[in-house]
Amino acid sequence: MKVVEVKHPLVRHKIGLMREGDVSTKRFRELAAEVGSLLTYEATADFETEKVTIEGWNGPVEVEQIKGKKVTVVPILRAGLGMMDGVLEHVPSARISVVGMYRDEETLEPVPYFEKLASNMPERMALVVDPMLATGGSMISTIDLLKDRGCTSIKALVLVAAPEGVAALEKAHPDVELYTASIDDCLNEQGYILPGLGDAGDKIFGTK
């Protein structure tokens, strides 16, 4: 599995700000979108282009346009919504596919509860977004679902990942690409990433 830990100074700085214990909901939400945008920039760097001729201000001009599969952004509810706007800055015409997963606090296993995907999934590249890759369960289950619907071109974008989650995702889906702002130290007994960001969903939505 291709794993890219984006080490751009802006990414490192913004993730550092997100780790502050007293970060406000507004600030955390803004930073989640900003880092999501920067991860998208990296994840789309290998998109193929083709030359086309358009009518410019002074006559025909040859330009490059992205070709290949159309993009669908797949936020995993609910926390993935916090990264979605940042992703859409770069691919504003992308279709949005929504998958609802929550983690059982006792078993730490993902439980699906909602699915609304774009049409023609086999023809699309999916950018799956979720702030945290902890055990990897929610991401793996979401990718399972996408593949069941015929989508074979998939990239996962997460703010922070635990080594355990990276290993689990690689074992389940070695053909998927992972882009993250940070691979942190480990998971604690409750399944939270250390040092991590805390509960990203609560911080994005202002719930406790």
UniProtKB/Swiss-Prot annotation:
Allosterically activated by GTP. It catalyses: UMP + diphosphate = 5-phospho-alpha-D-ribose 1-diphosphate + uracil. Catalyzes the conversion of uracil and 5-phospho-alpha-D-ribose 1-diphosphate (PRPP) to UMP and diphosphate. Its cofactor is Mg(2+). GO terms for molecular function: GTP binding; magnesium ion binding; uracil phosphoribosyltransferase activity. InterPro entries: PRibTrfase_dom, PRTase-like, Upp_B, UPRTase/APRTase, Ura_phspho_trans. Disulfide bonds: none annotated. The keyword Translocase does not apply. This is Uracil phosphoribosyltransferase. One of its GO terms (biological process) is uracil salvage. Binds 1 Mg(2+) ion per subunit. The magnesium is bound as Mg-PRPP. It comes from the Bacteria. It comes from Shewanella piezotolerans (strain WP3 / JCM 13877). SUPFAM superfamilies: PRTase-like. Belongs to the UPRTase family. NCBIfam families: PRK00129.1 (NF001097), upp (TIGR01091). Uracil binds at residues 193, 198-200. The keyword Nucleotidyltransferase does not apply. 5-phospho-alpha-D-ribose 1-diphosphate binds at residues 78, 103, 130-138, 199. Its EC number is 2.4.2.9.
